[in-house]
């Protein structure tokens, strides 16, 4: 499956499920089960209930998704600001 076939959506994490899965409600009200992407797992990015996330959905199965980004209020995508010592 090519990347251009994926559907990008935004949603809210309702519940943390076992095995690194999450129950997510999309902005349009659709509910699905999602898992974290490999880069998020590799960088130990924690996702909790109530977090705003971006997901990728396959057009073939809209009941499953992959979480690609966790949105933090007041901060956009990009590197974290460096703290001076």
Curated annotation (Swiss-Prot):
The keyword Nucleotide-binding does not apply. It comes from the Bacteria. Residues 1-72 form the S1-like domain. Keywords: Cytoplasm, Initiation factor, Protein biosynthesis, RNA-binding, rRNA-binding. GO terms for molecular function: ribosome binding; rRNA binding; translation initiation factor activity. Pfam families: eIF-1a. It is found in: Cytoplasm. PROSITE patterns: S1_IF1_TYPE. One of its GO terms (cellular component) is cytosol. The keyword rRNA-binding applies. Component of the 30S ribosomal translation pre-initiation complex which assembles on the 30S ribosome in the order IF-2 and IF-3, IF-1 and N-formylmethionyl-tRNA(fMet); mRNA recruitment can occur at any time during PIC assembly. Belongs to the IF-1 family. One of the essential components for the initiation of protein synthesis. Stabilizes the binding of IF-2 and IF-3 on the 30S subunit to which N-formylmethionyl-tRNA(fMet) subsequently binds. Helps modulate mRNA selection, yielding the 30S pre-initiation complex (PIC). Upon addition of the 50S ribosomal subunit IF-1, IF-2 and IF-3 are released leaving the mature 70S translation initiation complex. This is Translation initiation factor IF-1. It comes from Polaromonas naphthalenivorans (strain CJ2).
């Amino acid at each position: 499956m090519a990347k251009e076939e994926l559907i990008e959506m935004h949603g809210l994490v309702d519940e943390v499920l076992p095995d690194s899965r999450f129950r997510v409600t999309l902005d349009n009200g659709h509910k699905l089960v999602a898992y974290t992407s490999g880069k998020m797992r590799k960088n130990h990015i924690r996702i909790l209930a109530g977090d705003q996330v971006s997901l990728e959905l396959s057009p073939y199965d809209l009941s499953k998704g992959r979480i690609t980004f966790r949105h933090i209020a007041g901060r956009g995508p990009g590197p974290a600001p460096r703290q001076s010592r």
